[in-house]
Amino acid sequence: DNLGNIWIGTFNGLNRYNKTTGLFQNHTSNEMQNEGLTHSSIWCIVKDNQGTLWLGTYFGGVNYFNPEYEIYTRYKASIHEKEGLSSPVVGRTIEDKNGNLWIGTEGGGLNFYNRRTREFKWYLAGQGRNSISHSNVKALYYDPAKEIIWIGTHLGGLNKLDIRTG
């Protein structure tokens, strides 16, 4: 992070390694609190251009984490597209050059989160023009020069999404 710490996602929470002190600190979910991690199993971590961490969890959606102040914002699954994720199982996350987030889910396809409008858009298998070949997303790669996202799926092969044209 911007403070020189190393963040490690595990099945048992988020761990911060302080290189100066050599000490670890563990962050786990607590069902009794509405703050903190939504789920302790961390599948992916992305540090955005502001230095904040986006954490993809297994069954807890996405957690936006400010490491300097240790503040979490939770993004969970929703039945309404604009309001949340299509699936709580998040395995891959990338940030585009506009600071927006692309979230690969297991079973819920690709989710786009517009940070300016705070709305989601879902790309699902078999859902018309913006569909992808399978809703189980295993890999994401962003090409900033061409503004293309490559989407690797389980059983559906490789998909190409030009984010300029949709």
Label every PLM stretch briefly.
Residues 1-166:
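Carboxylate-rich, polar loop motifs that coordinate divalent cations or form catalytic acidic clusters
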